Amino acid sequence: MDAEMSEIRIEKGCAGELPDILDFANYVFSQSSQPHDFRRLLPKLYGENSGSEGYHYLVREDGRIRAMVCAMPLSLLVAGKPLRAAGIGTVSVHPYARGKGYMKALMNRAMEDLKTQGYAMAFLGGMRQRYEYFGFTPTGTRASFHLTAGNLAHRYPGLSGDGVSLSPLE
């Protein structure tokens, strides 16, 4: 950590801090893309009385949240046996606090805690190349869909397929 980071606090969120955590996430994500409402998008995590404050690792400067990483515990059932996992998300740094190493510090702290606490795995979405620094690699299933003239003929008799195109969903 550099000299600036030695003057900041890294801590877990506490009960009652959900409004501040939610405001911070909504602000940062809304600044970098479209308007966000995490309470609506993820009600189990950010709904009222969800109790999720403690899943959040926070960097504070002068008491104000400047960066955040959520590590939400999940229990997966694999071959009939429970597997402790964590979903990493809401990774965010205030626009004025970028470049200070806060995301790296929070990700390292969260990953170390998960290892120490016996979690078998963690997963996330988002900018995968960014998270490869922390040991994440793309995995999983990929679905491919093929639409042929025969598919169209059975669903839409008389349609030739000329002029039909598919576009990726965004």
Predicted features, each with a name:
Residues 2-73, 80-83, 87, 153-170:
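Short amphipathic alpha-helix that is part of the acyltransferase structural core
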Residues 74-76, 96, 129:
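Short coil/turn motifs at secondary-structure junctions
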Residues 111-118, 164-169:
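Long alpha-helical, hydrophobic tracts
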Residues 115, 145-155, 162:
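Long, low-complexity intrinsically disordered regions
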Residues 51, 60-65, 93-98, 115-119:
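Short, solvent-exposed loop/edge-beta patches enriched in aromatic
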Residues 90-93, 99-112, 123:
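Conserved acetyl-CoA-binding loop-helix of GNAT-fold acetyltransferases
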Residues 19, 23-27, 104-112, 116, ...:
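A broad, structural surface signal
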Residues 116-120, 126-145:
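Conserved active-site alpha-helix within GNAT-family acetyltransferase domains
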